[in-house]
Amino acid sequence: MLTERKKELIEKIPKAENHIHIEGSIPWELALRLAEKNKVSLPVHSIEEIDSWAHGLIGERGLDGFMICDRTLNSVCLHEEDYEAVVLALAEEDKRQNIVYQELHLDYPLNEERGIPLEVVMEGYRSAQRKARELYGVEIVYIAGLDRTLSGERCLSFVKSLRPYLDMVAGLGMDCEEKGHPCIKHLDSYQEAKRMGLFLTAHAGEDGGSDNIWDALRKLNVQRIDHGCRAAEDPELIRYLKERDILCAMCPVSNVYSGAAASFEAHPFLTLLRAGVPVSISSDDPPYTNSLTEELMTDAEKMNLTEEEIIRVVRNGFAYSIQGQGYLPAFDAWVREFQRKGAD
C-alpha cells in the first residue's frame, strides 16, 4: 500500500507528460457525443460497452487489438472543432492532475485514411494548443507521429507536409504495430525531419526486439525512445542509453495491459531506472489505461518506488522534454517545500 505521504506527493506534484496519443486518448464520453453529432455509427453505444469491447479486443490481440479500437473511436472526428474539442478535453483533465506541460503525439494518418484534410486536423489542434494555455495553463507540444505500417514514401510525404506547421509541431515520432515494420523503413522521413529541425523520437522495443531500438538510435539518430521495454534485456544497450543520457518514455500500465510486459513485477522499468537510464512515466492512452496520476500511483505501489525515485521520474519528464526545461526551477522549489514540510 502507498503511504499517505506518497499519495499526496503524486497528486500534488507538478507534472510533465512525454508520451500520450491524441487519437488514442479521446475521452469515451466525448467520443459518444461526437459520434451522435456527426452521425457516425459505432459498434458500441455506452461507456460500459466501450470498456467491455476494448478489453476484449486488447486482451485477445494485444497492440493489434488496441489499434482497432483506436481507429474505430477516432472515426468520430470529422471537423476542425472536433479535433479542438479532443485536445481541450485533455487539457482540462491536465489541469485537474497538475500537468503543466504535455507532449501529445498526433497521428494524422489515422485521419488521412478517412479522407480528412491535413489542414482540418492541424488547425483544430493549433486552436486547442492556444486555448489550452489560456484556459487551463497547460503548455501543449505536438509530436507528429508516423504510422510505421505505411510505406516509406507515404510517410516522407507526410513529413514534408508539416512545413507549414513548424510553429506548432516540435517533434517527429513513429508508432503503430511494430512487428514486421522495422524503424529503418522510415530513414528518409527521419532525415527530412532532422533537416526541418524537429526533435526525433520513435516507439521501439514495445512489442519488437532490442534490434529495433538500436536501429532507432544508430540509424534514425533519435533523441528519445518511446517505451523501450526490450532495452532491459541488452546490457550493452542499457550502458548506451545511460552513457548518452537518452530518455525512455515508458508507460508501464499500458505495457502490462497490451502484453508488452508480463506483469508489473517483470516490467523492465525498474531495471532501467536502477541502472541509471533516464526514464519517465506517461499514460499513453488514458481511456484504456489510467490517467497520469493513476498511472504514477499504480506504478509506485506495484514497483515499490521510493519517494526519491518518484520525484526523479517525474522530474525527468521536464528535464528530458522537448521544450519544458523552463519549468524545472518551479518544480524543484515545489519539491524542496514538500520535503521541508515532511521534515518539520
Regions found by a protein language model. Name each.
Residues 203:
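Short HxH-centered metal-ligating active-site micro-motif
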